[in-house]
């Protein structure tokens, strides 16, 4: 039943901020008012809210009000588990407590994830033993007693945990287990028997989570499940008319990942082994033969984007599609209830194979400019064995988002970094927000005084970076001098692990302060060590660009080794560049430069995490200052004071190090 809320958004926001010990922030108030207006008018809203704005309260307060008034849920989607946990474990409980006396009833909230994230009781009790899937394991592990016993121990622990856990949520298991172990006790949506057929349907952890979400006022989920809900034949999320997408800068990539598919020898072999006891041997032999021929072909073929499918590969894909489809039909005729779970799992894999092969074949029917999918072949080195993967992914997810997300719900998209080159247009285009769609962009700024707190230093005197990805001797000298001036306290963000490791080795020889490198330990442990010792530096690659939050004196220098353009041979992004060019646009600026600008904004955003932080972002790529696109890239970063004077920067870092030493 809908409720009447007598107090306004500004009034409730003020109560919440005061109760949580915060302070009034103009950007937060402006954002909350804009979110409330969007929910009222149905106009989509894109909000850039810098670190420190308090954006979660700015959208949660109007979301709760509308949920109570409309008696309908508001869905909040995030990219990362960390933000999900922050919302469900901290922000929402504190907010609900603070507003209890000001609202007609206590709001309810729930966390909902994809089915694979929850334990499957049917799989645990009816089909799981450590040896059940031995024939699906890599050959080298079948004879490794350590690997076998490790899997067995994990499965035993998971089975015991199933009888004590309330949620069955993988993220609640401490310590966690690897993907292979978790796959022994979980199922995908396709593998699920369904609540009506499953003997454990009434106890199902996933169904319980969906039930709780159906009763909630605010449902917290992730971009992957949001994408699954968009493409699924039946609804996964509760019916909703209002949606908030936090960490929206990741939305297009996460949706692309969900909409992608692949074919590998391992998947084909697993499918053949799963059906051995379920169907006529001739059906199995047909699938095995088609799989063997296809696997041999992709191992021998040249990796890279496939613009034209040759007749031979098309024949192999057709044979694979038909064999998988026939096997699926044979499984569906089975009626033995004792093998229902096994048949469901096998059927899911076969459907995936058949659908993916069909999709790849269909993608080559139209001419190149009109294609909606990109197909490419990768050869991955996995320890001692090579792995060939044929992948297909959408060229764009704009139409999917426009028709299946924005057409269904008024949407607020927010992040600290959404403008590229000073404009929302690039992001809006990637999402499918066009001039025909009612939307507006709003930048509420940041509580930080960037020009007084930070310096953007571009090392214009350095030679342009080489194609091999490794740093020049001049660049390594520059890194050593900057870290020495900063007294350690450096986060080094590199475009590749090769470059990060090379710089780490060089700095360990030259510097007296510790240098950690991604891969030395878990990322969380490395960040803890980095935070605990102000003299320590931490080098790494992409995950550190976006996932590190180190406020205070432990971080005063962010090093970026080169402009993070995508690889020229990246099949998906190069195809997108070509598609833009075919329409008369600038493919490099629209795709490659925008990709780099977003990563640069994310990386430089690691520097200032609270209003008292100070420091330098140093870009060791002279093209940032000399190339035509340099101004576009700089306009995408926070408004730091800018310089190319190395002497000034080193002096500033030394002053900052002395000041922090006195203060601490």
Curated annotation (Swiss-Prot):
Stated regulation of activity: Helicase activity on G4 DNA is inhibited by porphyrin derivatives meso-tetra (N-methyl-4-pyridyl) porphine tetra tosylate (T4) and N-methyl mesoporphyrin IX (NMM). Helicase activity on forked duplexes is not inhibited by T4 or NMM.
Binding locations of [4Fe-4S] cluster: 120, 192, 198, 204
One term of GO molecular function: metal ion binding
Renumbered ranges of motif DEAH box: 246-249
Keyword Membrane: no
Top class in the EC scheme: isomerase
Keyword Metal-binding assigned: yes
Signal peptide location: none
Catalytic reaction(s) noted: Couples ATP hydrolysis with the unwinding of duplex DNA at the replication fork by translocating in the 5'-3' direction. This creates two antiparallel DNA single strands (ssDNA). The leading ssDNA polymer is the template for DNA polymerase III holoenzyme which synthesizes a continuous strand; ATP + H2O = ADP + phosphate + H(+)
PANTHER family: DNA REPAIR DEAD HELICASE RAD3/XP-D SUBFAMILY MEMBER (PTHR11472), REGULATOR OF TELOMERE ELONGATION HELICASE 1 (PTHR11472:SF34)
Protein name from the UniProt record: ATP-dependent helicase DinG
Species, as recorded: Mycobacterium tuberculosis (strain ATCC 25177 / H37Ra)
